[in-house]
């Protein structure tokens, strides 16, 4: 008798055959729907495209070559771009050439800057650092030049800042010691902890009064003038001298305070304006006291209110070292290039600028950066 061959159950066999077919059919349907979604976008039928994605939320809005965001930038289709961003399209998605949507928008020229480049940049600022296969970033395509935000530059700026602050602190301490040396009579006086300026001035006033009283007593012991007249005159003279001393101490305190503020302002230069310092919010009253965002005129331009980029660049150069000192002038221009580089400026001040003014401000910053680059090239 022959053994009967093992039989595979019908349900198991049908399941093993249907699974790959079902998966392939599902993938094919999804790809057809994604192609239909892209056709709707190309034809301008945005309502149908949105409805299709709502019925089938699993579709990939970035699928296709080139991706839909790249197509919208190339066709200058701003409504399609806004719809894709609202539906979750990724501006950092790269095509087969390594380009992101920001690369595609940057290649469309200045006309596409406000409607295409800025919305993509606002959605994904980190995409500015992505390079394509040619090694280009979106900023380099726009002509912004290489960014100066490398780790070495950051460390160099930090070391220069620390060096300047140490130098400033040393000068202030020297000036403080010089002022104290004018009034101290006893060099052996020691303090356990630093005393404030007001306590120091009060102590000097008391010591001066005690010294004067001692001199008066010694003078009275050697030659005794008439008691009533001499006593009243000495008190009047003592009060007058104490009053003059307090006035001089207050004047010196005000002078020191102004000197510290002036040196600190010179040390900070054109850094980010702080609420406690004079800045664009004091120059433009409409932005002060109510925490409003900056407009174009509120930005701390080199020239008040902005203006011609060449004029602003010339003003910055005029504030630096003389032309005879080529090395110092080049270092100064390098610092200004870092400060007014569009990438750096956007990272630091984007949250403080009105959205509808951002395009105009960044256009002026870009032009100023290019003018500074030309000045730096002229020194080579």
Curated annotation (Swiss-Prot):
It comes from the Eukaryota. Residues 1-34, 131-166, 185-293 are annotated as: Disordered. Keywords: ANK repeat, Nucleus, Phosphoprotein, Repeat. Residues 237-286 have a biased composition (Basic and acidic residues). ANK repeats lie at residues 64-93, 97-133. InterPro entries: Ankyrin_rpt-contain_sf, NFKBIL1. GO terms for cellular component: nucleus. The modification Phosphoserine is found at residue 150. The keyword Phosphoprotein applies. GO terms for biological process: cellular response to lipopolysaccharide; negative regulation of canonical NF-kappaB signal transduction; negative regulation of lipopolysaccharide-mediated signaling pathway; negative regulation of NF-kappaB transcription factor activity; negative regulation of toll-like receptor signaling pathway; negative regulation of tumor necrosis factor production. It is found in: Nucleus. Involved in the regulation of innate immune response. Acts as negative regulator of Toll-like receptor and interferon-regulatory factor (IRF) signaling pathways. Contributes to the negative regulation of transcriptional activation of NF-kappa-B target genes in response to endogenous pro-inflammatory stimuli. Interacts with CACTIN (via N-terminal domain); the interaction occurs in a pro-inflammatory-independent manner. This is NF-kappa-B inhibitor-like protein 1. The lineage of its organism: Eukaryota, Metazoa, Chordata, Craniata, Vertebrata. The gene is NFKBIL1.
């Amino acid at each position: 008798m022959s053994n009967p061959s093992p039989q595979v159950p019908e349900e198991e066999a049908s399941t093993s055959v249907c699974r790959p077919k079902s998966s392939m059919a599902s993938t094919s349907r999804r790809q057809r729907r994604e192609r239909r979604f892209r056709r709707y976008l190309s034809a301008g039928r945005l309502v149908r495209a949105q409805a299709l994605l709502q019925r089938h939320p699993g579709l990939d809005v970035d699928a296709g070559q080139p991706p839909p965001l790249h197509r919208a930038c190339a066709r200058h289709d701003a409504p399609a771009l806004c719809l894709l961003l609202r539906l979750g399209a990724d501006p950092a998605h790269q095509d087969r050439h390594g380009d992101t949507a920001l690369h595609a928008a940057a290649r469309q020229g200045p006309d596409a800057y406000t409607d295409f480049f800025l919305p993509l940049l606002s959605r994904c600022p980190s995409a500015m650092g992505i390079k394509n296969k040619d090694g280009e970033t979106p900023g380099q395509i726009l002509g912004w030049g290489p960014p100066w935000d490398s780790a070495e530059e950051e460390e160099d700026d930090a070391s220069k800042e620390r060096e300047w602050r140490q130098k400033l602190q040393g000068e202030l301490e020297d000036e403080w010691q010089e002022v104290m040396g004018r009034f101290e009579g006893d060099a052996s006086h020691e303090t356990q902890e630093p005393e404030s300026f007001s306590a120091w001035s009060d102590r000097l006033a008391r010591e001066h009064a005690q010294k004067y009283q001692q001199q008066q007593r010694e003078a009275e012991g050697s030659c005794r003038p008439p008691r009533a007249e001499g006593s009243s005159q000495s008190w009047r003279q003592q009060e007058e001298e104490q009053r003059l001393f307090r006035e001089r101490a207050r004047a010196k305190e005000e002078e020191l305070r102004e000197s510290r503020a002036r040196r600190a302002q010179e040390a900070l230069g054109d850094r980010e304006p702080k609420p406690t310092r004079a800045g664009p919010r004091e120059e433009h009253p409409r932005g002060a006291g109510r925490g409003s965002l900056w407009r174009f005129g509120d930005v701390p331009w080199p020239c008040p209110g902005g203006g011609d980029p060449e004029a602003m660049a010339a003003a910055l150069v005029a504030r630096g070292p003389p032309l005879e000192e080529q090395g110092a002038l080049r270092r100064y221009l390098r610092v200004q290039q870092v400060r007014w580089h569009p990438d750096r400026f956007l990272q630091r001040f984007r949250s403080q600028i009105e959205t509808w003014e951002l395009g105009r401000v960044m256009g002026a910053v870009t032009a100023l950066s290019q003018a500074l680059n030309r000045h730096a090239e002229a020194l080579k």
